[in-house]
Curated annotation (Swiss-Prot):
The keyword Secreted applies. Coiled coil: none annotated. The modification Valine amide is found at V17. The keyword Secreted applies. This is Signiferin-4.3. Its main location: secreted. It is found in: Secreted. Inhibits the formation of NO by neuronal nitric oxide synthase with an IC(50) of 40 ug/ml. Expressed by the skin glands. Keywords: Amidation, Amphibian defense peptide, Secreted. GO terms for biological process: defense response; negative regulation of nitric-oxide synthase activity. It comes from Crinia signifera.
Length: 17
């Protein structure tokens, strides 16, 4: 769901920082 996509996006952003 949207929560899964949001969580995945957060992980992606964190991995780039």
């Amino acid at each position: 769901g949207f929560a899964d996509l949001f969580g995945k996006a957060v992980d992606f952003i964190k991995s780039r920082v």
